């Protein structure tokens, strides 16, 4: 079984179906809520950076690279190579300030002496791609998430001069909380299919 971004969606829909709405909402809104969500779930599949304090443990599953993309009105930028300073000249879409992804990009921009100041903040990662397709700005997306739209030429990849650090998909669980048989089996299946 391949580990990919669909696990997050699977967890979310299973949680919603089984009425685990508090856990699904806590994870969907903001990764810093992992600790709170662990009160209601056996494990979570999230992206780094993840704030994981004892007794929580994390297992790295799969690396991923994020790329800069824009709608088709930004096609000309696809043949250029932009610095992060130049990216700031265009409207930018990101996740909200309370998310770990925002904090990650804020630190990337700060390391280049820049402030991250997005024009549009999305509540969830799956809202970003439609906003890009609606020409609301540029955004950083995981390459696997952007790939289908890139192939269909619905969006364009914009090369960067500055390197964006690789991130990881990881599984977070409470090492002091016993899991049921089904959760343990699913966790083992996910972990055995990593990388």
Describe each region flagged by the PLM.
Residues 14, 87, 130-136, 171:
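Hydrophobic residues within well-ordered alpha-helices
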Residues 14-28:
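Short helix-boundary/capping micro-motifs
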Residues 30-33, 37:
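Residues within the DNA-recognition helix of helix-turn-helix
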Residues 47, 104-156:
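Hydrophobic hinge/microswitch elements
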Residues 53-92:
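Flexible hinge/capping segments at coil-to-helix
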Residues 57-67, 152-165:
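Short beta-strand->loop
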Residues 77, 91-112, 179-183, 187:
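Secondary-structure junction motif
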Residues 156-195:
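A late-sequence structural motif
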């Amino acid at each position: 079984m391949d580990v990919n971004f669909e696990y997050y969606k699977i967890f979310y829909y299973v949680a919603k179906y089984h009425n685990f709405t508090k856990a699904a909402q806590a994870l969907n809104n903001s990764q810093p809520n992992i600790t709170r969500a662990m009160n209601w779930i056996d494990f979570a599949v999230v992206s780094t950076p993840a704030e994981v304090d004892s007794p929580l443990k994390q297992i790295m599953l799969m690396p991923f690279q994020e790329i800069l993309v824009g709608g088709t009105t930004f096609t000309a930028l696809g043949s250029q190579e932009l610095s992060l300073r130049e990216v700031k000249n265009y409207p930018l879409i990101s996740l909200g300030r309370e998310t770990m992804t925002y904090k990650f990009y804020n630190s990337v921009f700060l390391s280049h002496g820049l402030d991250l100041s997005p024009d549009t903040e999305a509540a969830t990662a799956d809202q970003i791609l439609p906003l890009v397709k609606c020409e609301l700005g540029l955004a950083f997306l995981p390459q696997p998430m952007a790939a289908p739209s890139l192939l269909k030429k619905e969006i364009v990849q914009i090369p960067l001069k500055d390197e964006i650090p690789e991130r990881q998909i990881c599984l977070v669980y409470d090492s002091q909380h016993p899991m049921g048989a089904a959760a343990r089996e699913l966790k083992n299946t996910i972990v055995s299919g990593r990388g």
